C-alpha cells in the first residue's frame, strides 16, 4: 500500500489513570477484552483483520481499577453511563467481528 500509515496504540498511564503501575498490562488487556479498544487492521477504510477476544469481560472490570472512573461507582453507581459504555463495546465487538465464531 502506498502512502501514509497510522498506528493507534493504547498505553495505560498509571499516574493519569489512577491505577497501580503493575496493572498496566492487565488494563490494556482488559480494554481489548471488553471491546472498548478493538485491535484491528484496515486498508482503504475496510477492516481486513482483527484480533479475537479470548475471554470477554464486562466493561465494569476495566473501569473499576482506575480512579479516573471512580465517579461512576461512588457515591452512587452510574449504571446508565456504564450501560452506554457497554453498548459501545458490544457494538465494537459486532462491527469488528471480535468474538470467535463459536462465541459469536
For the regions a protein language model found, what residue spans apply to each?
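Short, conserved beta-strand edge motifs with alternating hydrophobic and charged residues
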Residues: 6-10
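Flexible, low-complexity linker and terminal segments
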Residues: 11-104
Amino acid at each position: 500500500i502506498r502512502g501514509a500509515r497510522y498506528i493507534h496504540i493504547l498505553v495505560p498511564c498509571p499516574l493519569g489513570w489512577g491505577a497501580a503501575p503493575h496493572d498496566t498490562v492487565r488494563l490494556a488487556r482488559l480494554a481489548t477484552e471488553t471491546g472498548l479498544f478493538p485491535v484491528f487492521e484496515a486498508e482503504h477504510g475496510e477492516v481486513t483483520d482483527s484480533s479475537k477476544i479470548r475471554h470477554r469481560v464486562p466493561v465494569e472490570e476495566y473501569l473499576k481499577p482506575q480512579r479516573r472512573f471512580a465517579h461512576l461507582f461512588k457515591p452512587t453507581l452510574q449504571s446508565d453511563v456504564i450501560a452506554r459504555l457497554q453498548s459501545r463495546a458490544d457494538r465494537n465487538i459486532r462491527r469488528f467481528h471480535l468474538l470467535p465464531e463459536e462465541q459469536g
